[in-house]
């Protein structure tokens, strides 16, 4: 049973995004946490700045598109890892849309928990602004986001953070 307080928390967090609200509620209910307000807050924390910071750090190191092999049911399967995989995870597993991802990345870049120089921060904010503008014109959110990640990798290499 979902409590009124949990519904109110979800409504506040999702800020009118019905798809995100439904996804959040389904995720909580599937785990039997529909009555637990702290679970809503933990879910939000899990999908906030930590994941965004991690994917920016991966991109700065040039790790945008990487593959690794895993054994799944006795078969070797190639799995996408790296910054692009993190974007996919945020969008698919956590129900964030492209605007949510951009907001999260902006929070990471303007916050001071990511130790980068101001010129690099300016480069990344400019690339993110272009990404945000491109998202408004594109039907496929992954394309502008991937372009942002590649620009981030180029900036990381230019500033000595990535090794090609």
Where in this protein do the model-derived segments appear?
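AAA+ P-loop NTPase domains with strong preference for DNA replication initiators
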Residues: 1-164
């Amino acid at each position: 049973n979902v409590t009124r307080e949990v519904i109110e928390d979800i409504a506040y967090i999702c800020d009118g995004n019905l798809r995100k609200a439904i996804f959040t509620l389904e995720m909580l209910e599937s785990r039997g946490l529909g009555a637990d307000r702290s679970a809503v807050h933990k879910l939000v924390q899990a999908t906030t700045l930590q994941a965004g910071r991690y994917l920016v750090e991966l991109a700065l190191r040039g790790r945008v598109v990487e593959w690794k092999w895993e054994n799944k049911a006795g078969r070797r399967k190639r799995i996408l890892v790296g910054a692009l995989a993190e974007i996919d995870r945020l969008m698919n597993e956590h129900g964030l849309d492209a605007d949510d991802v951009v907001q999260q990345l902006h929070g990471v870049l303007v916050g001071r928990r990511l130790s980068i120089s101001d010129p690099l921060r300016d480069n990344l904010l400019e690339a993110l602004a272009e990404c945000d503008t491109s998202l408004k014109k594109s039907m496929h959110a992954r394309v502008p986001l991937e372009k942002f990640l590649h620009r981030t990798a180029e900036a990381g290499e230019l500033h000595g953070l990535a090794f090609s």
